[in-house]
Regions:
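Surface-exposed loop/turn positions
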Residues: 70, 131, 164-165
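Short, flexible/disordered intra-domain loops and linkers
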Residues: 148-150, 179
């Protein structure tokens, strides 16, 4: 399923692959889960279990989705931090990443019922139409500087999901003004001391230089409209106007 008029820039896709390959070779764990537990493999994978318990399990329960025997796909799998937990629930796990080096390292762990595949950074080529039950992505789109690449992943999710399949994406959901390679961002803090209530979150405005670490923000209404235009029903949105916005839904 292509999005007419929405084509990621080749220069960005090449830069993303190059930079994340370098990061994977330098210290994959540090760049995936920056940086405190990067030197301890056990703690690194334990953090994946914690994030799964926080961001995946409750969503599956809210949507009354039973993952057993189902196919789950993760966009931006890295070296398998969350995959190591996800394979316990799903009948089959597919992890995709823009970095072939990340994929090589993830494959080396030989997780059961798991396959890993390098992708271009803007599509899910090689994944069958209507062959996936759940698509998940965490701490990935925030690093993508090309908004069209993010939206292509939305479209590819609509393509690969079975009818009634579900998805959950994390992204930066800030107000933005694009100025070429720069981006003005405005939103609400989501720091640990300000997450208990929206009223206690303080506003901020900042200027960001877009690269393969500081990616685009997607405004909440824009994310919802794009999903709906692709036949993806948005069931819930959390963390609007923060760097921890979640969009979850179901294929119609």
């Amino acid at each position: 399923m292509a999005i007419e008029g929405h084509k990621p820039e080749r220069k960005w896709l090449d830069a993303i692959r190059r930079d994340w390959d370098v990061r994977a070779r330098e210290n994959a764990r540090a760049f995936i889960n920056w940086p405190d537990i990067a030197d301890e493999e056990g703690a690194f994978f334990a953090s994946g279990r914690e994030d799964y318990a926080m961001y995946v399990t409750p969503f599956l329960k809210r949507t009354q989705f039973d993952p057993h025997g189902k196919v789950g796909l993760e966009i931006g799998c890295g070296i398998g931090r969350i995959a190591s937990r996800m394979v316990e629930d799903f009948g089959q796990y597919i992890g995709v990443d823009v970095s072939p080096e990340m994929i090589r390292k993830a494959s080396s762990y030989e997780l059961p019922r798991a396959t890993f595949q390098a992708v271009s950074g803007g599509d899910l080529n090689g994944i069958s139409d209507s062959g996936v039950d759940f698509v998940f992505s965490f701490a990935v789109f925030q690093h993508v500087p090309d908004k069209e690449a993010i939206f292509n992943y939305f479209a590819e999710t609509a393509r690969v999901l079975r009818p009634s399949g579900i998805f959950r994406f994390h992204m930066k959901g800030l107000w933005t003004l694009a100025l070429g390679r720069m981006q003005i961002e405005a939103g609400l803090s989501n720091s640990a001391s300000h997450v208990t209530a929206r009223a206690t979150r303080f506003p901020f405005v900042r200027l960001r230089y877009l690269d393969t670490w500081q990616g685009r923000s997607i405004r909440p209404a824009e994310a919802k409209a794009k999903c709906e235009s692709l036949g993806l029903e948005v069931l819930e949105m959390e963390g609007e106007w923060t760097t921890m916005m979640w969009v979850g839904g179901r294929k119609k």
